[in-house]
Curated annotation (Swiss-Prot):
Pfam families: GTP_EFTU, GTP_EFTU_D2, GTP_EFTU_D3. Its EC number is 3.6.5.3. This is Elongation factor Tu. The gene is tuf. PROSITE patterns: G_TR_1 (PS00301), G_TR_2 (PS51722). GTP hydrolase that promotes the GTP-dependent binding of aminoacyl-tRNA to the A-site of ribosomes during protein biosynthesis.
Amino acid sequence: MAKEKYDRSKPHVNIGTIGHVDHGKTTLTAAITTVLARRLPSAVNQPKDYSSIDAAPEERERGITINTAHVEYETEKRHYAHIDAPGHADYVKNMITGAAQMDGAILVVASTDGPMPQTREHILLSRQVGVKYLIVFMNKVDLVDDEELLELVEMEIRDLLSEYDFPGDDIPVIQGSALKALEGDTAQEDIIMELMHTVDDYIPDPERDTDKPLLLPVEDVFSITGRGTVASGRIDRGTVKVNDEVEIVGIRDDIQKAVVTGVEMFRKQLDEGIAGDNVGVLLRGIQRDEIERGQVLAKPGSIHPHTKFKGEVYILTKEEGGRHTPFFNNYRPQFYFRTTDVTGSIELPAGTEMVMPGDNVTIDVELIHPIAVEQGTTFSIREGGRTVGSGIVSEIEA
């Protein structure tokens, strides 16, 4: 547990890179950290190379990013926590947890390819998990000689964004080469700086739900010898500080109480973690096996575990990557809440025999484990590793 205090003088924003596999998300992440370290040197702005961001061994063996890398950097205006979201379709599950943490995202599209299946999927996921602001970085422009082709690709990206209710005509599109910027090409470094100015200006300072009761979805749990158990994740709303009493809610039938003995972010101690911060929370009296991913830390009494609710859902079409066939009563997919999948059964409204791809319907859901949910909690419906629907809890039933 580090002792250095975390600087809060600049607004803090969570962003990330999304887009199709091999379009240059990780290279762009490396370029942003490297160019900012050259142009705006500070304790925070440290260059990260491709291999350190692409860190987990299975990623490098397969040449695909799997886990979610967190890096930090700052512009003159802001402090950023940046997630390099996985690109490969098998790892969409991780993408969902990553995208859920973003105030805005940079959609990376290779100019050589244009939008690809995962470009569409990531735009859809951003829409589902509430990422409101996207900025487009058209990468690899150095490999395209034809100006008209670049214009065509840009139009195609804008149309795709509009299709998913993003303001496709107004979204900023920056064209450049992340690799050339990384290699020190001055003109391309300027473009990376232009991208960051655009991110500063286009993504508004997030409105934080600091006045609401604490809700922190647990992403990871580890123990520190002699100190206790740490639960980490992004604070969804509210605040947490030392000596606060919290409840651990969901998955298990009983609710546990714990006392917070430490809060840290980027290895620095915090007086208080607030909504939007990625923090580790040290809990007194909790064993490593008494808390798990998928649970939440919450202000006592503020949220309860439920297994039955009504949900308003949209079922994806085949073209959107959803099911090709309808589903019927008692369909049992996975429901993805915040950081975890839970199996549940679906009861259709009286008189509805089946639900077709593209339908919008109210369903009754019964989960096999209780989850901390309330009216307004969003979820994805998943089956065999792919998203087939998206929904919001409209009413708690049990």
